[in-house]
Amino acid sequence: MDKTDMDAVFMRRCLQLASLGRGHVSPNPMVGAVVVHRGQIIGEGYHRCYGQPHAEVNAINSVRDAGLLPECTLYVSLEPCSHYGKTPPCADLIVQKKIPRVVVGCLDPFPKVSGQGVVRLREAGIEVVTGILEEECKALNRTFMTCQIDERPFVTLKWAQSRDGYIDRLRKPGEPAIRISDDVSSVWVHRLRAEADAILVGTNTAVADNPSLTTRLWYGRSPLRIVLDEHARVPSGSHVFTDGLHSLVITAKDTVYPVLPDSVEVIRLPFGKDLIPGLLNELYRRRIQHLLVEG
């Protein structure tokens, strides 16, 4: 197996580790790292939670014999940071530990990094290889990449439908929906919720189903709830307004909305063709990277 093939093997392990941070690190990206000495992994780590140490720090700190680091290769799925944020620059730690070779899956498009991590390492005389499993590394963080590059949230549309294309029957308010999804798919949906930053429904879904839009069948956080309600038709006693969790209501600029609890924020945007661009811009401003649309 040549060096490039070996690099791919260890980068795949970085991706496995990085995925363990799913649902816990946003708005940061998921990142995994391994430290390799003479073909053997002697340390590994991943970014576990937003605000906590990055993957490179955890991987380096997990090495029992720090004296081996000047003989090691560090693999990391995303370019090491080069700026001060909630944690110090990972690039500086790598230089300090005298690690001679670093293999990077993909560059970080975040403006404060954007290639500067690689520059910092190379200026210190470190061999840097980039682009190993690059597409896989980008795909893992597609929500982060979309937000940084396109300056909008990544949007996931979710629905359940019958084989012949129906999603529900015609029903009066208060009538239960016909259940199409099963228990397994319901758990999967709640996993999606735990991984999303926000979840959105329209007026009809909010009125007909009175959903909670919380994460209950999977571990993790509940997303920010967003209700599109142009004409204030959603009852003020709905679950999304009364359970004390944070919700946003998007309504028209001239709509008079009833007084709601402090946990509910009312945002006024122009509806029509400008609604989606305006909504995505508002969510980007709030650092929402992944929007799940459920109805």
Please provide the spans of the model-predicted regions.
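Short, basic/aromatic recognition patches
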Residues: 6-26, 147
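Short, small/polar residue-rich loop motifs at catalytic or cofactor-binding pockets
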Residues: 27-30, 154-155
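Glycine-rich beta-strand-to-loop/alpha-helix junction loops that act as flexible
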Residues: 31-32, 203-204, 294-295
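Short beta-strand scaffold segments in enzyme catalytic cores
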Residues: 31-39, 158-160
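Zn2+-dependent cytidine deaminase-like catalytic core
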Residues: 35-138, 224, 253-255
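Short acidic/polar active-site loop segments enriched in Thr and Asp
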Residues: 100, 289, 294
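Active-site ligand-binding patch in enzyme domains
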Residues: 146-290
